[in-house]
Amino acid sequence: MATEYRTASWKLWLILDPRRVLTALFVYLTVIALLIHFGLLSTDRLNWWEFQRGLPKAASLVVVPPAVG
């Protein structure tokens, strides 16, 4: 049965246009990716843009070595 499926699967592309299938797949995956990203941005916990505003500046984390005199 598995051998019959592998040998006959090429017939699907005689019915479906590969260019249309790949274009539709690209559009579908792009829409899904945008929905997921905007969904994450709309939450308080997983919003990576708003999260960075509350963090201290990186300059305050710099350690200055003591002067050796």
UniProtKB/Swiss-Prot annotation:
Periplasmic side: 42-59
Residues the entry annotates as binding a bacteriochlorophyll: 37
Name recorded for this polypeptide: Light-harvesting protein B-1015 alpha chain
Mode of membrane association: Single-pass type II membrane protein
Subunit structure: The core complex is formed by different alpha and beta chains, binding bacteriochlorophyll molecules, and arranged most probably in tetrameric structures disposed around the reaction center. The non-pigmented gamma chains may constitute additional components.
Residue intervals passing through the bilayer: 21-41
InterPro entries to which the protein is assigned, alphabetical: Antenna_a/b, Antenna_alpha, Antenna_alpha_CS, Light-harvesting_complex
UniProt similarity note: Belongs to the antenna complex alpha subunit family.
Intracellular or extracellular location(s): Cell inner membrane
NCBIfam families per record: pufA_517_ASD
Keywords: Antenna complex, Bacteriochlorophyll, Cell inner membrane, Cell membrane, Chlorophyll, Chromophore, Light-harvesting polypeptide, Magnesium, Membrane, Metal-binding, Transmembrane, Transmembrane helix
Listed GO biological process terms: photosynthesis, light reaction
Cited function: Antenna complexes are light-harvesting systems, which transfer the excitation energy to the reaction centers.
A GO term from the CC aspect: organelle inner membrane
Segments on the Cytoplasmic side according to the record's topology features: 2-20
Lineage, uppermost ranks: Bacteria, Pseudomonadati, Pseudomonadota, Alphaproteobacteria, Hyphomicrobiales
Pro-piece positions: 60-69
Any one GO molecular function term: metal ion binding
SUPFAM superfamilies the record matches: Light-harvesting complex subunits
Chief localisation class: membrane
